[in-house]
Amino acid sequence: MSLKPTVPMTTAGRGIAQADLAGRFVYKFDGNALRNNIVHRICGIGQFTLDAAGQLSGSHTSSGMPLQGSVKTGVLVGTYVLTGKMLLGSDASLGDAHIAFRSETPGLDSVDGKFCFAIAGAPDRLWLMSTGATIMGKPEPINIAELVIIEAIRIAGS
């Protein structure tokens, strides 16, 4: 008797094109970010639509709290509108994303985020990790030290 996995054991390889990633995805994320020299734990959920050319639009809700010191205001919760681009690399299994997270919550910053992503077996599941972030709308760029991992699952085709 031969056992075959239902999902390939390795990430997707050749044969995947940018247009194969088009569709609507839901995702969850969590990680840490340094703000005012204090580490904050952040997590959230959201959704995005990716078109055949890699244009991305969506929204998410996140929460965060400092991991040291007092929490005077409790958990910070914010909502964001997303716009950006996710482009598959030449090896057809890894790519890069550049996403603007525009805050809809007074007092919370908008962020320009950069990510590396991998196709996790098939184009219906993507893994992303942060590779850089900058606070938007300031006179000079303010880099954010953050480490975030995201898992996105396609719920509808293009």
Protein language model features and the residues they cover:
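Mature soluble binding/inhibitory domains
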Residues: M1-S158
